[in-house]
Amino acid sequence: MAKEYSRTQRIGDQMQRELAQLIRREIKDPRVGLVTITAVDVSRDVGHAKIFMTVMGQDSAEEIAQTIKVLNSAAGFLRMQLAREMKLRSVPQLHFHYDESVVRGAHLSALIERAVAQDGQHQEGSASPDAKPESTEE
């Protein structure tokens, strides 16, 4: 049986695809790098949409904040372009947010790899469970 998605999820999925193309094609500001739209959450009344995004190659908080500021200032233009592409009675207001889950996921992955490596070193340093301890008595 096919999964059933709510209307807001379908709108969010389409907005994610359309916004990715629009930003790449229409936004020529040099402060906007390679933006990836990771998710779009549309409110139930379809009045607002939170757009979660990451920027490749921009790691500092200042660069990311600048990109978000540029995208939020271009939100009206992007909304107008979305209205042309999507067949909706009203297009939601766009609010751009930085998606920290990607950075958090990479950090957790690095922590897990480090813990596994330390565990492997610890096991190599200890005696095998079948070996008998050497006696130091003479």
From Swiss-Prot:
Family under the similarity heading: Belongs to the RbfA family.
Function: One of several proteins that assist in the late maturation steps of the functional core of the 30S ribosomal subunit. Associates with free 30S ribosomal subunits (but not with 30S subunits that are part of 70S ribosomes or polysomes). Required for efficient processing of 16S rRNA. May interact with the 5'-terminal helix region of 16S rRNA.
GO cellular component: cytosol
Organism encoding this protein: Pseudomonas savastanoi pv. phaseolicola (strain 1448A / Race 6) (Pseudomonas syringae pv. phaseolicola (strain 1448A / Race 6))
An MF annotation (GO) of this entry: ribosomal small subunit binding
Protein name per Swiss-Prot or TrEMBL: Ribosome-binding factor A
One BP term from GO: maturation of SSU-rRNA
Gene designation: rbfA
Keyword Cytoplasm: yes
Pfam families: RBFA
